[in-house]
Amino acid sequence: MFRESNTNSQSSIFNTLWLMSPKMKERLQASWAHTFRQELFVHIPESLFAPLFSEIESRPNAPINIIVGAEVLKAGFGWSDEEMVEHLGFDLLTRYGLGLDEISAEAPTIRTFYNLRRRVRQYAEETGINLYNEVFARITDEQIAKFLVKTNWQRMDSTQLLSNIARLNRLELVIATLQKGVQALPEVRQQAWGQAQETYLSKTPQNICYRLKDEAVEEHLQTVGQLLVTLLTELQTSQAPSDIIEIVTRVISDQYQLVANSPIQLKAPTEISATSVQSPHDPEATYRYKHEQGYQGYVANLSETCDPENEVQLITSVQTAANCIDDGQLLADSLDELAERQVAVDQVTVDGGYNGATSEKACRQHRVKLRPTTIRGGQTKAGVWGWEAYEWTLDEESGEPRQVTCPQGQTVSVQRARKAARYAAHFDETICGDCPFFHKECRVQPRRHQPPTLNVTLRSIQVADLRQGMSADNAAIRANTESTVHAFKHPFAGGKLPVRGLIRSHMMACGSALMVNLRRLHDYLHPDSTENMAQEVGLPHILSANSLFWRVLVGFIASFYRPQIVPLAKSCY
């Protein structure tokens, strides 16, 4: 049964704040934990999680705000689950930030965290709604409104996030898939397979492949491929879990060609798609080769405010997707989400990876000016004016050209040509004849039975419009997104997430983005603070979990305080 936490309950005499000196209390309230508590923790919309619980009268849930808040801290500080539990139990700053003011207040157990993660994942699979994304949106929108952050001008960048999987070669991949598929069979059949195929099932894929010579790899690939086909048939007849059947089916389809009445055939490496399975333990992870480096996992796209008048800039949206998705599609998804949340956006500064038909169409739809720092595509050959030298008037709705003005100031209308997505503009023959650039740099061409004509494709006009919007200050504005990406990925060593799967990866991404915003708000609210949130979480040593002060305090209170019932996070109900 769902029950929201009560954050307004009266504190007991064992509240740790009452036991502090005024100076210590002042330092605590100037710490990141106080900012976290006031600007994030108390704004967690617990009601979003109500659909995860039964409506029948039953045992109530653990405090959702504490669980979600701890997950945000875990993502923002790069904690493991064990470290998170340790901080929840013994770190004063963490407990204060999560509303656990009383020494007797018990934090949720690790099993409680596991259960909520499972429910959030299942809910996302069923509805397509990731509740952590909703939490990020609600909290961020409130912060934008409270601190009067202007959102009209935004900048955007994407970054690779590695999944928590081992990097496998083709043979290791198919062997790992075979082993995972066999584990889904009934125990009797597992034993039969283990005896018949001990070569591939008794060791890890890496140990099996380690001593193989290069010339033997293809033969083993053929053998394992045939075993996978046999295994797939048995999995289907034994009613194995559908996700296992799907993984085995995908690996066979990715790596092999099935020809009727003939042995299975191995695909050439060039025929394998970037969307192919990278690991049977994370079938959603994809492959991306970028900047001469291969990545297995996902891509995160960050949008943040960048108006120079803002005193603090905030990340406004986070997308997490397969890393083979084009940046233009991520931009379109971001604009759709921001529009749905009624976040006003007039212009977006991006790098050259974002321009393209998809992103430009989305910008026209949302009436947003796309401002790339560079443009993908070739350059105009020397001695000829680029299309950006001409001034184009475009229809706001369709994006089609209506007028064009040449560099010498002659303005004419633009008509559709016979071929699709092509246009023609007819200039005055007398004016063009007196122009010193006619027959030279100008793209207007003479015609025998027609006036001088400018023929152009719609795509050339669109690229020209983008080039005209480029400026030197645009590059400086976009450059700051690199620091945002660094802060976002810093908790994840080597850019590798501690989780697998798209849903869990997005949960971590939202948590990290919330902490980036929280750090910025803390610096804004406490500009004179010397505290470094990226380093030690605790206050000075006197307030740390292992300090003499803390151990003596706990021992003193425990010596005479023996409650019959220990409330769970009493101060937060």
What are these regions (language model features)?
Residues 52-64, 76-132, 148:
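Trp/Phe/Arg-rich N-terminal binding region typifying the photolyase-homology
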Residues 80-83, 102, 114-573:
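Anion-binding and metal-coordination hotspots
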Residues 1-56, 553, 559-565:
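Basic, low-complexity segments
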Residues 61-65, 69, 506:
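Structured ligand/cofactor/substrate-binding pocket environments in proteins
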